[in-house]
Structures are given as C-alpha cells and as structure tokens.
Regions:
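Mid-to-C-terminal secondary-structure elements
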Residues: 129-144, 154-254
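Peri-transmembrane interface segments
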Residues: 42, 239-242, 254-287
Length: 296
C-alpha cells in the first residue's frame, strides 16, 4: 500500500513540475478534437442543405442572367452589364435545338403585408409553364395560375411555404389577400416548404405571379433571368448553344467578351466543392496548430 501511495505521490509531483506542458497538451488536444468535430459537423450539415439546393435548381435546368453563380462575386465587373430582355428569350426559343421549355423569371424584393403583419419577400414574375418546370418543390395546396390569367394580367399569386407560416400561422392561405407594395393579390396556390436556398433565392420566401402582372405593376428596375429546360444528357451542349445564341441576340462582336452568364447546377457544385475544401483546410490548419502547441 505504501508503494502505491508513493507512486501516486511521484505522479502528482511530476504533474506539478511539468504543469505548463501538461496544461498546453490538454488544451491543444481539446482544441484539436473540438475543431475536428465542428468541421465534420459543419461539412455534413452543408452537404445536406446543398443536396436540397441542387434538387431545387435541377440537373436539367439552365439559368441565363447577368451574373455568374460564384462565391467570389466580383460585383464591379458585372454591375454595368446590359439587362436580360424578353426578346432574347424569343431568340433562344426560335433557334435552340436542345431547349424543350423556357420561362422568363423577373425578380424584385418588395414589402408584403397581411393584416398587422409585414415582411420583405421576393416577387417572381413568370410564364404559366413555370409551374411545370419547378424542381425540388411543387404546389401542395391550390394551383398554379393559368394561361388565361397570365394573358389577362390577373392579380393572383402562389406563395412559398414560409409565407404561410409567417402570415397565416399554419392556416389555409387560399383565397386570402396579401398586399404587395400597396397592391392587393389573391393567393391561389402554395408551394411545398423545402428549406433549401439556391443562387436564385429561396423558394420558401417567394411570391410567384404572372409575368404580365409583374410588368404592369413594376416599371422600375428588376433583376431578370431565363429558366431553360433541357435533357440532363445534353446540358453541356445546350449551355454552349445558348451562349452562342445569346451572343447573337445581344449583338456582341467576335472579340467582345460575354456580357451575360449561363449557369447550371454543375457550375454551382464546383463552387460549392471549392468552399468545402477551404472549410476543411482551415479546420486542418487549426488542428495542426493545436497539436504543435500540445507538443504532439
């Protein structure tokens, strides 16, 4: 027994004499383990959200806009690009061999209100066939607007899942009227809530209306893009074809650079993978430093 107490005493004396080293080793190991756990959890969570986003974008969709989807957003190089115009979509529909469906999509943030509640939401003005092109979500309550409602510029809207929760506290929103920028609109449909976010915005926080109605009530600047559908097998051919058609439609000379961007899920995936590598690299750096400090 005396020998046991003696060994314990020697151990405590050793710890006491090397307290700083033991302390740094413990702290270093703790930080290292904590960092690895946090980075692993973060990457896993991002992967799940990204999978939802990719589903919402669609692997058969092409998005034509003024700016590329990039985490390294260079606003100053893109801000003076000419707007995307509807007549350019007509060019694509006329000359493309790979595009099977298309829709104009106009975007604008506005103040939405219902009774004593208000929120800023994204308005989308689209064609009637946009409802058929939606991926990753669907109309789960009510319906999409019709060709006739589009032609007659009806004030009807389809709302994202979060709009129902925010304005109606889970109650059925169909038939209710929301004011957008002071103009009253009737809700005829509700989108399934996805929880996803894409470079084009969250479908949970969106209000969709006929593009004709959108253009009638909004004469100010809006952010426009084309949503084009093709076969997943032809996505790269379709992107290059659309790029060439857009150059003609925008009257660009051979030596001039593109003043528009042709985006798709694969480009977004590439950007996302680069971001994941950067996050993992930072985690490894912090872990490495902590292990060096701990003397391992």
């Amino acid at each position: 027994m005396n020998k046991l107490f003696k060994n314990i005493s020697i151990g405590f004396e050793s710890i006491k004499s090397n307290f700083t080293r033991v302390f740094l080793t413990s702290i270093g190991l703790t930080i290292g383990i904590f960092t690895v756990s946090i980075v692993t959890a973060a990457v896993s969570s991002i992967d799940k959200e990204f999978a939802k986003s990719i589903q919402s974008i669609g692997n058969d969709k092409i998005y034509v806009g003024r700016m590329p989807w990039s985490f390294e957003f260079d606003w100053w190089n893109y801000r003076n690009r000419p707007e995307i115009k509807e007549e350019q979509l007509e060019y694509i529909n006329q000359y493309s061999e790979f595009i099977t469906q298309s829709s104009m999509k106009q975007n604008y943030w506005t103040r939405a209100s219902y009774e004593n509640k208000a929120s800023w939401l994204q308005m989308n003005g689209v064609y009637p066939n946009y409802g058929e092109m939606l991926t990753g979500t669907k109309v789960v309550n009510g319906r999409f607007f019709s060709e006739n409602e589009w032609k007659l510029q009806r004030r009807v809207i389809i709302v994202g899942g979060s709009v129902r929760e925010g304005f109606f506290e889970g109650k059925n929103p169909l038939g209710k009227k929301i004011r957008l920028g002071g103009v009253s609109f009737e809700i005829i449909g509700e989108l399934e809530k996805t929880g996803s976010f894409t470079p084009t915005g969250s479908l949970d926080q969106v209000i969709i209306m006929p593009s004709t109605t959108f253009q009638r009530i909004l004469t100010r600047w809006t952010w426009n893009e084309f949503v084009l559908q093709t076969s997943p097998d032809n996505i790269n051919k379709a992107k290059e074809e659309v790029r060439l058609i857009m150059r003609v439609a925008r009257k660009l000379k051979p030596e001039q650079e593109d003043n528009f961007a042709v985006n798709s899920a694969d480009a977004f995936t590439k950007q996302f993978n680069q971001m994941k590598i950067a996050i993992a690299g930072m985690g490894l750096l912090v872990t490495g430093i902590s292990l060096i400090v701990s003397g391992i």
